């Protein structure tokens, strides 16, 4: 029993030393490359531990704007890295996992936007921040869940096409009944 416990403790210590060495290497690389690490709440705890900033996508986008570092390593889904690049075109934005994606971000298309534009007069296309750069490019305004109601109320347009999240659109429509909402069928598969 004693030998078994010693071996387990030894293995734990080896893992701790490796983790410390990796953290030290990351810190050194951040200095050499003038880089900062942003991590979304959804990433693994060990990634959050080495990050300079941890938060939701809106918080991290705001943080990204004020950074002095030339390289942003964004640990999150692709639309978050795209948003950081849009807000910081002069900086290098790296995504450690290019396969990290949010399916809802792709649940609308430029073609759908143009189709709806052709069917409605006095239309504003309102895009939730959790969407691709392509959707943002075809929209009139981009909002977050915390500012969407205020922005939609302030829009002069009567018709609102909210993309890509139908659930957030329904919520906003309930608070802004004077607008006519056209619903996209996008949704978050995690929250559905």
Label every PLM stretch briefly.
Residues 20-192:
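Active-site loop-to-helix "anion-binding N-cap" substructures in soluble metabolic enzymes
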């Amino acid at each position: 029993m004693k030998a078994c416990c010693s071996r387990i403790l030894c293995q734990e210590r080896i893992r701790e030393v490796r983790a410390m060495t990796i953290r030290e290497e990351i810190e050194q690389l951040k200095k050499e490359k003038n880089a900062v690490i942003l991590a979304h709440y959804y990433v693994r705890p060990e990634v959050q531990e080495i990050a300079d900033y941890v938060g939701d996508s809106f918080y991290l986008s705001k943080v990204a704007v004020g950074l002095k570092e030339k390289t942003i390593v964004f640990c999150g889904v692709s639309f978050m890295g795209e948003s950081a690049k849009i807000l910081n075109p002069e900086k290098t934005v790296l995504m450690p996992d290019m396969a990290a994606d949010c399916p809802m971000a792709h649940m609308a298309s430029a073609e759908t936007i143009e189709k709806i534009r052709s069917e409605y007069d006095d239309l504003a296309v309102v895009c939730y921040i959790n969407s691709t750069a392509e959707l943002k490019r075809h929209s009139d305004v981009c909002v977050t869940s915390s500012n969407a109601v205020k922005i939609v109320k302030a829009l002069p347009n009567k018709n609102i096409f909210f993309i890509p999240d139908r659930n957030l659109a329904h919520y906003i429509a309930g608070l802004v009944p004077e607008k006519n909402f056209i619903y996209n069928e996008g949704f978050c598969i995690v929250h559905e």
